[in-house]
Amino acid sequence: MAVKHKSESLKHEEGAAKKAKTGLLKLKKIMDIESNVVKYSICIPTTVIDNCNNLEQVTFTAYQIARTAVLFNVQEIIVLDQSKDKKHEKKSRSKETISDCLLLATLLQYFVTPPNLLDTTFKKKNKLYLKCASTFPPLNQLPFMNASAEQHYKEGLSIARDSSKGKSDDALTNLVYIGKNQIITLSNQNIPNTARVTVDTERKEVVSPIDAYKGKPLGYHVRMASTLNEVSEGYTKIVWVNSGDFHYDEELSKYHKVETKLPYIAKLKKSSTSEKPCNILLIFGKWGHLKRCFRRSDLESSSLHHYFSGQLQFPASVPQGNIPIQDSLPIALTMFQRWAS
């Protein structure tokens, strides 16, 4: 009995040693925004679909992300390939032959693609992965998703002119495909080939989508990245949102540095009336995965906590890290938009 008691005591001491002292001194900061206009981009790791067992579950997760992004007028979604940053291989989902990164990016793009351009946007070999996506309700907050609205405006894709006619510049065209085998010839414009444009079908000219749709959300752009240096160019501030880490414990010593050296953002402060947008990038995911991704990246920052402008602390009812990434999105964006208003 004495041996058993001693063994339990040692285990208790070892467990206590792994934990940092309570009452960590957490830094807080007011994030200065030198603009009156704030735009948001989000970076979603491929680990967001690690627990999905089939295509239907993957599609639903992508739809949740897309719907939130449209509701909050997110400008861009970056899909971060973290297949090299996990200690364990993901479990296979049926007979999928494309990477999680490409699958997630394809689904996210599908949900903001106008119905009349679906046939030209996606390759036939990838349409297999869209069979579940077509069953979800369209995101009707986007004006071009509603066939009955703004009838004389159409989303189109510029296509090359017949090269046999010997046009002077093959990189430019005046032809725009608007779906259902309909092609509009622009009256007095030449535009680059394979460009997504908004067309006034009555005047037969390309117009600004902001003017055409009267300031309504226009959806987001999707791109893929495999390292943090591919992610971070072009943003004014970069913020980490701790999410998707159901074993996160701030008292563990391995999280000591991030808890004490990466400040929590208390609020935003607009110090300028400039109309030049401040672009804020929110990066979601586990700290451990991001650290391994950081080591693969060619960045000037000496450590990961220097890479970020700060981190977000959710309300007390939401445990740090212990929330699915797709559920953390609306909370994070609500907090930022409230601060910026």
Curated annotation (Swiss-Prot):
GO terms for biological process: methylation. Present with 2820 molecules/cell in log phase SD medium. This is Putative methyltransferase YGR283C. Pfam families: Methyltrn_RNA_3. Belongs to the class IV-like SAM-binding methyltransferase superfamily. One of its GO terms (molecular function) is methyltransferase activity. It is found in: Nucleus, Nucleolus. InterPro entries: Alpha/beta_knot_MTases, Put_MeTrfase-C9orf114-like, tRNA_m1G_MTases_N. Its EC number is 2.1.1.-. GO terms for cellular component: nucleolus. It is an enzyme of class 2 (transferase). Keywords: Methyltransferase, Nucleus, Transferase. Disulfide bonds: none annotated.
